[in-house]
């Protein structure tokens, strides 16, 4: 069986890469260049994919997504201009576009399974990270691609960040998560015991919080 994994180079998608390697015979990783402020994540993703022994392909989707602090390199701690209840990092349509491209790529290589690291437990309120959204898109892709049923797997959907750290330990990729993954929205490469980043942005704060919770529980 073949699976396509959306690999950004961050903690969650890298953990899902190793989940996919345990659950599928062939794994193909894809990433997206959307002019993100932390574009170094793509370099890290390529390194991670090579170490994992999987093929990695980057799609250029610059100019196809709505404005956000990630695209415009703005203040990630402010609310979104689209909805004040969402953070500025919310990029409308991002996961929908990425998963649709992944579906098309599945058709090209003869795969039926997509793996993504979206999560609605410790997430930032992104509406495209909810399981209801994923289910709706899974149905649309299954109907529209003409290749039979598409399955979108979300191994982290109901896990806290601390539980995601534990999963990395279980999969034997904890060292890789700490050493190689880039979660920081600003692409800060300062190294700490929990990995690279700076606690000036929400993504890194969540990563750090989960790390110390997992450590306190004896999971890592």
Regions found by a protein language model. Give the residues of each.
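Functionally engaged cysteine thiol sites
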Residues: 16, 184, 198
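Iron-sulfur (Fe-S) cluster-binding segments and ferredoxin-like electron-carrier domains
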Residues: 188-220
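Glycine-rich phosphate/adenylate-binding loop
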Residues: 172-189
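ATP-dependent adenylation/nucleotidyltransferase module used to activate substrates
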Residues: 1-174, 204
């Amino acid at each position: 069986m073949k699976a396509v994994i959306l690999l950004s180079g961050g903690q969650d998608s890298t953990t899902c890469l190793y989940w996919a390697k345990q659950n599928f015979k062939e794994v193909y990783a894809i990433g997206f260049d959307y002019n993100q402020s932390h574009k170094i994540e793509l370099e890290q993703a390529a390194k991670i994919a090579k170490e994992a022994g999987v093929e990695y392909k980057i799609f250029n989707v610059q100019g196809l997504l709505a404005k956000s602090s990630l695209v415009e390199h703005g203040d990630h701690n402010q609310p979104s201009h689209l909805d004040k209840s969402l953070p500025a990092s919310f990029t409308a349509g991002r996961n929908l576009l990425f998963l649709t491209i992944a579906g098309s790529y599945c058709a090209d290589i003869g795969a039926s399974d997509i793996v993504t690291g979206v999560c609605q437990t410790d997430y930032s309120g992104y509406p495209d990270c909810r399981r209801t959204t994923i289910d709706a898109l899974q149905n649309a892709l299954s109907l529209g691609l003409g290749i039979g049923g598409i399955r979108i797997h979300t191994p982290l959907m109901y896990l806290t960040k601390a539980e995601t750290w534990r999963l990395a330990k279980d999969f034997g990729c904890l060292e890789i998560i700490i050493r190689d993954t880039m979660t920081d929205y600003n692409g800060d490469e300062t190294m700490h015991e929990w990995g690279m980043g700076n606690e000036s942005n929400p993504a890194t704060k969540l990563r750090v919080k989960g790390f110390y919770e997992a450590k306190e529980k004896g999971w890592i």
